[in-house]
Every structure is written in C-alpha cells, then in structure tokens.
Amino acid sequence: MVEPQVAPIAPMMRRIRRIHFVGIGGVGMGGIAEVLLNLGYQISGSDLRKNQLIQRLLSLGAQIRIGHDPQHVEGCDVVVVSSAIDEDNTEVSAARGRLIPVVPRAEMLAELMRFRYGIAVAGTHGKTTTTSLIAGILGEANLDPTFVIGGQVNSIGANSRLGKGEYLVAEADESDASFLLLQPLLAVITNVDADHMDAYGGDFTALKAAFLEFLHHLPFYGLAVVCLDDPVLRELLPGIGRPVLTYGTCKEADYHLRELKQTQGQTQFQVARPGKDNWLTVVLNLPGAHNALNALAAIAVAHELGIADSAIQRFLKGFSGIGRRFQCYGEIATPAGKVLLVDDYGHHPRELAATLEAIRAGWPERRLVVIFQPHRYTRTRDLFEEFIRVLSQVDVLLLLEVYPAGEAPIGGADSRALWQAIQTHGQVSPILVEDKEIIGEMLFDLLQEGDLLLTVGAGDIGALARRLSISLEGKR
C-alpha cells in the first residue's frame, strides 16, 4: 500500500510563520491551533482562564498567556479570533492598528480545508457525534484523515488531529453563520432547528437560507448528504441544486434503517443502501435513535468513499465515544446504593428529549434524576415552553442557574422563572439549586439505589459531573 502524503499547505500560508489565537481555549479554536502546530507553524494564544485544552497545547509547544494584552500580538503574522471575542478586544485592536490580518476561526479552517478533500458536517444537533463517526471510520479504513471536532474524542484524548491522508473532516458551525466561509467537497446536514436565532435576527427563514447557501458552496461535482427525517431539510431539498444523497428512517431515503433495537448503551439496526441488495447489520456503541441517524449519515459518507463494510461495522461497534456526549461514568457507589452517572452536552429541548428517550429505552426500570444547567438567557427565553414540556418528563429535577456565556440576564428567562413554570405544570416538583457547591449534599438525601443520574447542559456542568463521580463515592 502506498503511504499517504500530507496534503500541500495553501501557497499564501507559506508567508505565515507565527499565528496568534485570541480565545485559544475554545474547543474549535484549540483544535485548529493543534493542527497548525503539528504542521510546523509557531502558535501563540491567549484566553481568560486555563483549561485542559490549553494545558495540552502548552505541552505541544504553543505559547499561551492568560489574559489579554496588546503586546501578545507583537511579531505574529496573522491573528485568529473566536466568535466569542468582542470587536474591541485589546489584542484585536492592537493587531488591526499594526495592519496584521485578523481572521475568524472558520476562515482559518477554510484554508486548512482548501487543499484537501473537505468533509463538513453542519446541523443544529448531532454535528460533533456525526463528525467523530465519519473521521473514525476513515481512520479505521487506514485513510488517516485530518479532523477538527467540537468535542474530545475519547480514543485519542483530543478534539483534533493532523493526518497524512487527503481528507479533512470538520464541523461547520452555524451559530454565527461562519460555516458560510467553508467550501467543502462533501457536506452533511443532520437537521435544521431554531437555535442561535440572535445571529439571524430572530428570523427562521434567514437561518434556513443560510443552510441552503452553505450547500451552494459545494462545487457542482460535490455531494450533499441530508437527513430526510427533518421537515426543514425536506422543504429545502428542491433548492439545493447539487448532487444529493438522503438518509433517514423512511423508505424513500437513499440510506434508510430498519429494526432499530437498543440494549442499554448499544443500538442495533440494519441499513439499506443504493446499489446494494443486502442489508448492512450495524451495532453502534451509542444509545438512542438520534445516534443511529448520526451513524447512518457517517455510513452514507463512508459508502460513497468506497470504504469496506467491515471497517464501518468494526469502528461503530467499538466506538469509545466523545467527551460529554452521553458520557457514562458507570455505576457510582453512593450511601443510598449504586447509581448510574451519565453526563451530556444537550442544551436544546430537542437534544434533551432525544437523550431522555434514549435513557428510557435503554434503562426503563431506573428512576431518572436530572441536574440541568440552562445555557444562555436568550435560548431559555426563546424556547421556554419547550423546556417546560421536556423537563417535566423526568422523575426528579434539579435546576442550576443559567450559564450566561457572556449574556446579560433577561427578566423571565432565568432558572427561577423556569422553576416556577415547571412547578405550575404539575408533573414534577423541581428543586432550584442556587449554590452548586452544596449539590453533593442535596443528592445525598435525594438519590435512591438504582437511579440514573444525568447531568446535562453546555456550560460548566461537565466539571460538576466529574466532581460528583468522586464525591458521591466518597460519602459511602
């Protein structure tokens, strides 16, 4: 077999030596920084606080400072900014004053993708899992892809990797419309839902138009892979104007599944594929019908790239997961007895509903105790009624205060308002937790043997899950 070669770097990047990242601790920023570091560029960066990703980049040779200062951009050739960074940031202003190019994260990702076979995964929900599955299957087939993913791939302990093959697999982020900077050869869209609406002026039509424009960035010989189960994607289908493959649960989809069965954390199903008479039997080491659809998208991509069925089946069965995507900490021995602890990144009602459905299907006999941290006041406001409906379905509910993600509080869109509304709804009596530090003591009285404890949200609740996995056992 011929050893794959690293794809060439864009010619214009040859003039670039040092690249500075403002907000380097973000998962998308840090992933790109690691790939560039491994390509031989000098990487520097700054952020407001240190985290595991920054520690990893430091160990790889990046120069990172905590806090922002104009002097940090001295000597750099280009500055990459996260969408979370304000325009008046002191480092950004200093770079512009020195006529140093300032580019958004997605533009740098587009440069990495430009001279490779770019595979971009977009969609409101399921991007990280689908991207991880595609990259993993390509790796299993010895295609050695480069990838940049919005979550830590457990098997390698990182969210990005520089490969020697021709493929680059990445998430395409619609939250700030930056995915419109990408020009992949193959694009996947998992679904389109109302989220990040502030970036689109609160106009769902504008959001749909952005997804359609994203697909129009494909070349005429490219390929769009879209989920036919999603009503919005069905609506957009006639306007795509590029080669299209569909996937879903309905028989009219090019790739469709049947006989879906879940046993605890594993899901089994069969897949029909165009041009194949036999059904492909798949065992996926993830729970839930939503993850089966994510895997189906990855199977469609893999099949189109000519990857053998055996490699697809082998990888999906052995998939070790992604950090904070239904991350199972296993059975924790508490004073009340053994409790199964699961942590998940879900922060939209549709994501919460999918996770709860997977839990009820895989562990129907367990009482479900949920600790939920809402993410952003705007999302809580915009999806308030949907949050009430979904969260009312659990057995025990603890509500943490909204994780603001830089937003100012909005009246009637905080956790107290959510708590009151769920109480009025009457199906569950939620507990408002105003101090996360005492939640371990609260759980001491609430938990029962055999419970499934789910921590869920996109803020800092993941750190709470890690602490609980230790502290609850310590109270035995």
Curated annotation (Swiss-Prot):
It is an enzyme of class 6 (ligase). Its main location: cytoplasm. It is found in: Cytoplasm. Keywords: ATP-binding, Cell cycle, Cell division, Cell shape, Cell wall biogenesis/degradation, Cytoplasm, Ligase, Nucleotide-binding, Peptidoglycan synthesis. It catalyses: UDP-N-acetyl-alpha-D-muramate + L-alanine + ATP = UDP-N-acetyl-alpha-D-muramoyl-L-alanine + ADP + phosphate + H(+). Its EC number is 6.3.2.8. GO terms for cellular component: cytoplasm. One of its GO terms (biological process) is cell wall organization. GO terms for molecular function: ATP binding; UDP-N-acetylmuramate-L-alanine ligase activity. The keyword Cell wall biogenesis/degradation applies. ATP binds at residues 123-129. InterPro entries: Mur-like_cat_sf, Mur_ligase_C, Mur_ligase_C_dom_sf, Mur_ligase_cen, Mur_ligase_N, MurCDEF_pg_biosynth, UDP-N-AcMur_Ala_ligase_MurC. Pathway: Cell wall biogenesis; peptidoglycan biosynthesis. Belongs to the MurCDEF family. HAMAP family: MurC (MF_00046). Cell wall formation. This is UDP-N-acetylmuramate--L-alanine ligase.
